[in-house]
Structures are given as C-alpha cells and as structure tokens.
C-alpha cells in the first residue's frame, strides 16, 4: 500500500495538523477477523484502548477517524460491509457526544451501535491514570442503535411430532 493519510497531534495542548494532501477517508486502522469495529478520534486513543484491553485484540477491527468526521468510517464500512457491531469510543466531551449521535445516524439499521464512553476525557487519560480508577471502571456503555429483531416462525417437523393411534368412530 501507499500512504494516504498522516497527521500530527499533541497530547499536552490543542495541537492538530494534517499532512498536506492527506485524505480523511483513510484513517489509521487495524482490520481484524470478526465483525466488530471500534472507532476512535485519534490513533493515541486507539492504541491506549488496546493497551487497556489487550485480550484477543487482533480479532477486532479498530479505526481512528483523525477527528470526528465520518469519512473514514464510511470508507472502512464500504471495504468491510460484513461489520455487524460498531463501538463508538470517542472522547468524553461535547464534540465526542455530538459526533456519536451523528455517526450512529449515518450507519445502516442493520448495524448495532454502542457508545463506549471513557470515564475520563479520552482513552489516553484513562491509560495514564488507570491506577487511580477504582475497580477498573474505565467506561460506561450506552446502546445507541439496535437492528430490529426478526420475527421467526416456528416450524414443526414431522419427526418432532408424536404418533398417536386413533380409533375410528365409524368404518369407511
């Protein structure tokens, strides 16, 4: 592959810069094998989350938006239409909250969407201060969208039926 997106971000101050010619549709990502996608604002938050929850991390897909734009999410889902569950792990601030609502509305109704809100401003802050967080309560989970449940019709098979001898009331 060839580079399509690059950016610089500061962790101490509000420094954000995208490289010249960077395409927001191609965010920092890991493509896993299962049908779950975890979405973050910045690569540092994505990596911090994996550090906090390393178990089977390779199975899941992870995507950094490079902010709160939905371009990278739409591009990722166009490449991976088999994704069934999206976890929006955006920052715990107004911009993150507003983006979660907007992004959830963009996703098809067949996709389950859950907001995973960090207990601090972002996932890097949670990682840095994890020793101070009681009982590893690093986040709260909020379901934003669930696909409609399909109504199934029960099928009775002959093999499941019970054979009962019947006595005729009259003979034909």
Where do the model's predicted regions map?
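TOPRIM fold recognition
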Residues: 51-172
